[in-house]
Amino acid sequence: MTYAARVDGLAGVHAMNAQLLGDTEYMSKVTAGAALGGGPAEDNLLRPLHGELGDPPPAGSVATVTTAVVANGAYADAVVWGIEMAQLVESIAGTPTIFGMNAFGTFGQVTWINISADTAAADAAGEATNNSADYMGRLSAIGDLFLPGSGHRSLAIRVA
C-alpha cells in the first residue's frame, strides 16, 4: 500500500510530518494499521526532473510506476535517457509522465510515473508503448546505465 503526498522538498515533508505526528487520531490509526503491513513504513522523496504534476488525478486513476537504479558513473547519461524516455512515452501513450530521481530512499533510484484516467486507459497506454518499435529499440540500447536487475514496475490506483 502506498500513501503519497505532494510536498515542497524536505521542509514540506517536515511540516507535514509535524502536523500528522501531533494528531492523536492519525497516530492511533497508524498503530492499528501496522499489523496489516508486511514491514515497516519506508519514506521516499522523488524530485521531479521532467513533467508537470498538474492537479491531483481523480479517484480511479492509475499510476504505472517504473523504477531503476542508476549505475555508478552513469548519472548524467541516465538522467538524459530517462527524460527522453518519459517524453517518448508521453508521445506514444498520450498520457502525462513524470520522471524524477530519489532525494531519499534507494540511492540512485530514478522513477517514471505514467498517469492514466482508469484501468482501460492504462492498458491502452501500455499496449501502445510496448508495440512501439522506437520504445523497444531504445530499451534494447540501454547499455550499462542501470544496475542489472534493479528495474521494477508497479501499479497504483487512486482510491480517494
State each model region's role.
Residues 1-160:
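Short S/T/G/P-rich N-terminal loop/turn motif that feeds into the first structured element of a domain
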